[in-house]
């Protein structure tokens, strides 16, 4: 069995405003930096053999904070980026509904094929995640791998590992700075811990 530690990046100014940042390279907020440090403390006793992160700063800095004092380098990959919202980047859902009513309608229907103007679709993001999943296959039994990325990216990865149709990705909840733990076996994967944020209690 290999063990996967899935971490969603910490808070950003954009997340506080409930805006869609996608590929926009926003920084962690002061709260997000504190969350990353609390994650480091939470995982301090874990043996971690490899660390992967999205190459967007909010994920990279979260991963680097967790990795502080370890010998492993953080491997940053564009395949782990959040979905590209294109023209919708920086907008909130109310603004999207006013400016792009048809896009908002299709989003509510969870259309996998919906491509954001100037951006990408969930199907295309799912393809990126598949490429990363193949990279994970090189890690052997007994290894623990930390993956720091974004909400949709991690949820699609979970679906793929669990053998679930990717259209169910939105039915998992992953909060900011949350920890999810999975075990992978030749016959499939097991979800051991989902969306755990106990490390944030009293530390926000």
Which stretches of residues belong to each language-model region?
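Phosphate-coordination/substrate-recognition cap region in phosphate-metabolizing enzymes
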Residues: 37-105
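Active-site metal-binding loops of divalent metal-dependent hydrolases
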Residues: 10, 151, 197
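Short amphipathic alpha-helical/adjacent loop interface patches that line ligand
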Residues: 36, 100, 111, 129-133, ...
């Amino acid at each position: 069995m290999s063990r996967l530690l899935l971490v969603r990046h910490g808070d950003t100014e954009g997340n506080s405003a409930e805006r869609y940042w996608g590929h926009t390279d926003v920084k962690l907020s002061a709260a997000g930096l504190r969350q990353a440090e609390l994650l480091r403390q939470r995982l301090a006793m874990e043996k971690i053999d490899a660390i992967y992160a999205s190459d967007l700063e909010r994920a990279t800095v979260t991963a680097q904070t967790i990795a502080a004092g370890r010998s492993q380098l953080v491997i940053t990959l564009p395949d782990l980026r959040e979905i590209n919202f294109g023209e919708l980047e920086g907008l909130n859902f109310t603004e999207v509904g006013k400016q792009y009513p048809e896009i908002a309608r299709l989003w509510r229907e969870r259309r996998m094929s919906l491509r954001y103007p100037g951006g990408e679709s969930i199907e295309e993001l799912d393809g990126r995640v598949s490429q990363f999943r193949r990279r994970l296959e090189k890690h052997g039994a007994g290894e623990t791998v930390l993956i720091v990325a974004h909400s949709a990216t991690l949820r699609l990865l979970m679906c793929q590992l669990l053998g679930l149709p990717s259209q169910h990705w939105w039915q998992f909840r992953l909060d900011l700075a949350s920890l999810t733990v999975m075990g992978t076996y030749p016959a499939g994967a097991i979800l051991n811990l989902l969306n755990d944020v106990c490390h944030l209690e009293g530390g926000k």
